[in-house]
Amino acid sequence: MEEHTQGSHVEAGIVEHPNAEDFGHARTLPTDTNWFKHAVFYEVLVRAFYDSNADGIGDLRGLTEKLDYIKWLGVDCLWLPPFYDSPLRDGGYDIRDFYKVLPEFGTVDDFVTLLDAAHRRGIRIITDLVMNHTSDQHEWFQESRHNPDGPYGDFYVWSDTSDRYPDARIIFVDTEESNWTFDPVRRQFYWHRFFSHQPDLNYDNPAVQEAMLDVLRFWLDLGIDGFRLDAVPYLFEREGTNCENLPETHAFLKRCRKAIDDEYPGRVLLAEANQWPADVVAYFGDPDTGGDECHMAFHFPLMPRIFMAVRRESRFPISEILAQTPPIPDTAQWGIFLRNHDELTLEMVTDEERDYMYAEYAKDPRMKANVGIRRRLAPLLENDRNQIELFTALLLSLPGSPVLYYGDEIGMGDIIWLGDRDSVRTPMQWTPDRNAGFSKATPGRLYLPPNQDAVYGYHSVNVEAQLDSSSSLLNWTRNMLAVRSRHDAFAVGTFRELGGSNPSVLAYIREVTRQQGDGGAKTDAVLCVNNLSRFPQPIELNLQQWAGYIPVEMTGYVEFPSIGQLPYLLTLPGHGFYWFQLREPDPEPGAQQ
């Protein structure tokens, strides 16, 4: 269908927005309020995945063409960073129009086509919604600065002085000297927690809250499965506070959740709150109600500690952060990840830990960005296949729903001489042909060059080559996702660390019990044992609770000796791991059922 409404426009000082009824709607999947707990997420940058029209930029139609690959891999949900209309001064997180798709990506109808095709394959799609701020080119901001007494005059946080909220930290210390910027048109300062071209919305204005709820409903009406709410801790400002995690923010999130539960059951809100776990759990809402704010939240502090634990060859960085993680409501789930489109953030570590991570993983100053490291997974791990597999096994087995980053399943590298975080946002490497099979455009027109490194370049690292090799990282990753999908324990099971005398080995049980139709119960118990050392390591585990059970290695279905009363001895190769299903012993022949 031809799109006849090209985004928002201003009429008589009022910004008019299109209606979802102006567009087609994607088919919906059966309502399942717990799907996100079982899902494997896959973050893909639209511009980086596949170019359908040879303009050098990936687009929505190109992503639609590659859905069969995503389905084959075993992904349950795509996470798309912002694809809205934007001047692209911050990778699309500076939104110019919430109701329009960036023209180089396509149209709203192209998105509906993508969503419908994904749902036909059983794949869900969530996208980022930047609630905290807009681009300074957004019509709301332009109306606000030109007409202070008009309907949008109070849509942003304005002040005659830059002295307000002095306790709020500056997030982008590399580029910003203040959270206030003077506007020569309105002759006032405006508030921004991020870049100065991203003014913060004023959520103390009820009209702003209603406007953002309307944005939610527009995309939900089209059929989208949920949103990652970007930068949610910063929605409100109060004197005498650091302007983060304020009660008013949680009150607004409860409004968003109620709209979802009442009008769009089965859709999901994921909080992006780069905070300590004790602070983040508040974004799940009231545990007595099962959670009444966000369904999911990222566990940011866990990720750097996985890297730290393996480099230190000690389980304690992981053990300690998990021990500090409070319980979450029954309806909630953590999202966990190794890498994404941003730098490997080191905000949630101590100064000493940050220095250690820089020394170990960012020896070249160009590898640093803001308070983090701008590298992909494979180069961070020196392209060591054993380490890559160990990290992936941890990602897939620790508590939470895992998020993969496009290209990590084939071991893509980065280009550190590209600016800002573009080093980890290069084109997907499909084939060894020109432009890595990403685009038919002339190479000079590509949005970023494909990686041509001797180790990580597309001539050697690409999907086509790895599809043909049964031992490739791609096929190994697909197999691990398939194994994980067969066991509810990974998705919703309890987590119990087993300790042990060897600090280089991290062992834990994931366990869930399901009621059966005959009134009985069935337990799915998985034992995960991870060697964080580069050297072979022995471990003795107290498994008396499982005496008589048989550990069955889950990738090769190999039975290990049954568990007895004595400590269970295992030896793991360097950076090796085991996943065991603990299987009940078969009944003795002739035993009564």
Curated annotation (Swiss-Prot):
The organism's taxonomic lineage, starting at the top: Bacteria, Bacillati, Actinomycetota, Actinomycetes, Mycobacteriales
Gene3D superfamilies assigned: Glycosidases, Golgi alpha-mannosidase II, Oligo-1,6-glucosidase, Domain 2
Biological process (GO), any one: polysaccharide catabolic process
Family annotation (Pfam families): Alpha-amylase (PF00128), Malt_amylase_C (PF16657)
Active site: 230 (nucleophile), 272 (proton donor)
EC number: 3.2.1.1, 5.4.99.16
Protein name in the entry: Trehalose synthase/amylase TreS
Residues holding Ca(2+): 132, 200, 234-235, 237
Pathway where this protein functions: Glycan biosynthesis; glycogen biosynthesis
Binding site for substrate: 90, 133, 198, 228, 341-342
InterPro entries, sorted: Glyco_hydro_13_cat_dom, Glyco_hydro_b, Glycoside_hydrolase_SF, Malt_amylase-like_C, O16G_dom_2, TreS/a-amylase_N
Task performed by this protein: Catalyzes the reversible interconversion of maltose and trehalose by transglucosylation. Maltose is the preferred substrate. To a lesser extent, also displays amylase activity, catalyzing the endohydrolysis of (1->4)-alpha-D-glucosidic linkages in glycogen and maltooligosaccharides such as maltoheptaose, to produce maltose which then can be converted to trehalose. TreS plays a key role in the utilization of trehalose for the production of glycogen and alpha-glucan via the TreS-Pep2 branch involved in the biosynthesis of maltose-1-phosphate (M1P).
Subunit relationships: Homohexamer.
Positions of transmembrane segments: none
pH effects: Optimum pH is between 6.0-6.2 for the amylase activity and 7.0 for the trehalose synthase activity.
Regulation: The amylase activity is stimulated by addition of Ca(2+), but this cation and other divalent cations inhibit the trehalose synthase activity. In addition, trehalose synthase activity, but not amylase activity, is strongly inhibited, and in a competitive manner, by validoxylamine. On the other hand, amylase, but not trehalose synthase activity, is inhibited by the known transition-state amylase inhibitor, acarbose, suggesting the possibility of two different active sites.
Phenotypic effect of disruption: Cells lacking this gene do not accumulate increased amounts of glycogen in the presence of trehalose and show only a small effect in alpha-glucan. Combined inactivation of treS with glgB or glgC completely blocks alpha-glucan production.
Reactions catalysed, as given in the entry: D-maltose = alpha,alpha-trehalose; Endohydrolysis of (1->4)-alpha-D-glucosidic linkages in polysaccharides containing three or more (1->4)-alpha-linked D-glucose units
Other comments on record: Maltose-1-phosphate (M1P), the building block required for alpha-glucan production, is generated by two alternative routes: the TreS-Pep2 branch and the GlgC-GlgM branch, however it seems that the GlgC-GlgM branch provides most of M1P for the GlgE pathway in M.smegmatis.
Record family assignment: Belongs to the glycosyl hydrolase 13 family. TreS subfamily.
